[in-house]
């Protein structure tokens, strides 16, 4: 049984120059989506039975940076943030993911503060990307600049 006092979330980024990146290029490793990562974090929060454990998501590479708190007292709030994101229409989730990876927003609520030019830039990336996996590759490449 593991009972940590502190859990810090760090989203995986596959960076050029690493063995994992080489595996990615050869197809031995495939990227998972931000939504899959969020679901994994949700499962961690939901299944944790520890008392007093502090969970933080305090880095720009984490999609939902505001998911932080004590697992015993803030669990429902953190799950609410995650469920709010997962409940967004797919297009809005993709736009938020791109805006976040472009360092333009921190939370989905920040999307309403974007300029029309920013929104057009995001839409251009979204609509000119061939498929969802190609989008994950673009997002991973954007995140490389943060580490």
Region annotations inferred by a language model:
Residues 3-8, 12-147:
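Auxiliary Fe-S-binding modules of radical SAM enzymes
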């Amino acid at each position: 049984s593991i009972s940590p006092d502190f859990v810090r979330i760090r989203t995986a980024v596959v960076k050029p120059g690493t063995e994992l990146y080489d595996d990615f290029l050869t197809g031995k490793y495939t990227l998972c989506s931000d939504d899959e990562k969020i679901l994994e974090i949700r499962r961690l929060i939901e299944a944790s039975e520890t008392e007093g454990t502090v969970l933080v998501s305090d880095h720009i590479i984490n999609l939902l940076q505001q998911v932080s708190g004590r697992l015993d007292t803030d669990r429902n709030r953190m799950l609410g943030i995650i469920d709010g994101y997962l409940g967004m229409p797919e297009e809005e989730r993709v736009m938020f993911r791109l805006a976040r990876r472009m360092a333009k927003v921190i939370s989905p609520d920040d999307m309403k503060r974007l300029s029309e030019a920013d929104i057009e830039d995001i839409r251009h990336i979204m609509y000119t990307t061939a498929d969802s996996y190609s989008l994950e590759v673009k997002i991973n490449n954007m995140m490389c600049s943060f580490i």
